[in-house]
Structures are given as C-alpha cells and as structure tokens.
A protein has these predicted regions:
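Electropositive, beta-rich accessory/interaction domains or terminal extensions
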Residues: 1-92, 98-99, 131-186
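Loop/turn positions that initiate beta-strands
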Residues: 68, 118, 123-125
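A generic structural motif
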Residues: 85, 108-110, 118
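A mid-sequence, solvent-exposed acidic-amphipathic segment
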Residues: 97-114
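Hydrophobic, well-ordered secondary-structure segments
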Residues: 109-112, 124, 139
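Hydrophobic beta-sheet segments that form the core/acyl-binding groove
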Residues: 127-129
Length: 186
C-alpha cells in the first residue's frame, strides 16, 4: 500500500482541522499497550487498530521515541513528530465518557509521524531507525507536558528547542512559558 505525504492511500481523516496534515500523516500505536487496556477495560473487544492507528507497532513506546527520529518502514521513511491528543471520537468509539481522560493520564498515546519519503508499505513491515534525535523531546516527555507536568521548565525549554517539533506546538509551549514567567514576575 502506498504511504504518501499526507496519509496511507485510502485513509481519510474526518476533520482535517484537527486530524491529518503533514505532521500527523500516519499514527502508530504500540502493541505493548493493548494488555494494559484489556485490564483497564475488561469485556471490551480490543482488536489491533482499535485506537485508530495506521500501524500497530512493536518496540516503539513513547519513552523510546524522540521528536525528530527518522525511521524506515517498507520503502517509506517517516519522522517522529508529536504525540496524540485524543478527540471526542475516541470516547464515542469506546462508548465511555471517561476515555479521553483515561487515555491522557495513562501516557499511552502512540505517536504521529510525518512522511519524509513516500514509498510502499505492507502488513508485517517493521520500523527500523535510520537516525536518532537523542537531544529532542521524547513523546513521553511531551505527554507529561500536556497531561501531568504542564509547567516543567526543563521540559518546556527542551520542547521549544526541539527542531522537528511542529510550529503550532512550539508556539503553544512558548505561550505557556511566557504565562509562567509573567506569573512568577508579579
């Protein structure tokens, strides 16, 4: 299946104001998280792809991925770009009003990739690192900034300094840092 700049062929995002685009071209979700959700949501059928992922990954958890890491899958090259902040559709899919909060608090967000080089991918293809951005913010760090440690100055500075972070996130974190600075100066 062709992996293109904006998505996998045939994949259509419903609301392009919050889904898709070059920094959210494809979504990966770790297979390692499914046992957690099976214990959290007993009786819920959780087949691969239940979280809306294009790729159910293995050995690519949030703490291991830095924004800016480049990986190959099949003939395509992707870059780690950002975490997932879920919308109401996740709660609707699971038929649980508390699903968004549970998802955020869990830190089990998965990752959005941009497509750096288009190519063909197939079921069973594995991700291989081409280059790492070890000084970049991890997806786990980004989750902390969003859900549990919003005013961590070290992480905010690191996020702002991460070259591959999408500009809208950089602006968001700069605004938060400015608010933080103004609160402390008064």
């Amino acid at each position: 299946m062709p992996l293109r700049t904006l998505n996998l062929d045939g994949d259509r995002q419903a609301d392009l104001s919050v889904h898709g685009g070059p920094y959210k071209a494809v979504y990966g979700y770790p297979s390692e998280h499914y046992p957690f959700w099976r214990s959290e949501l007993p009786g819920t059928d959780l087949p691969w792809g239940m979280f809306g992922e294009n790729f159910t990954t293995q050995d690519l958890c949030e703490g291991d991925l830095h924004i800016g890491d480049r990986l190959q899958i099949g003939a395509a090259v992707v870059m780690v770009r950002q975490t997932r902040t879920p919308c109401y559709k996740l709660a609707a899919k699971f038929q649980r009003d508390d699903m968004l909060e549970r998802f955020l608090i869990s830190g089990r967000s998965g990752v959005y990739f941009s497509v750096e080089e288009e190519g063909t991918v197939a079921s069973g293809d594995s991700f291989q690192f081409l280059s790492r951005a070890p000084k970049g913010l991890t997806i786990e760090d980004m989750n902390r900034l969003i859900a549990s440690d919003r005013y961590n100055r070290t992480l905010l500075d690191k996020a702002i300094a991460t070259p591959a972070l999408p500009e809208d996130w950089r602006e968001h974190f700069l605004e938060r840092l400015a608010r933080m600075t103004s609160m402390h100066s008064t």
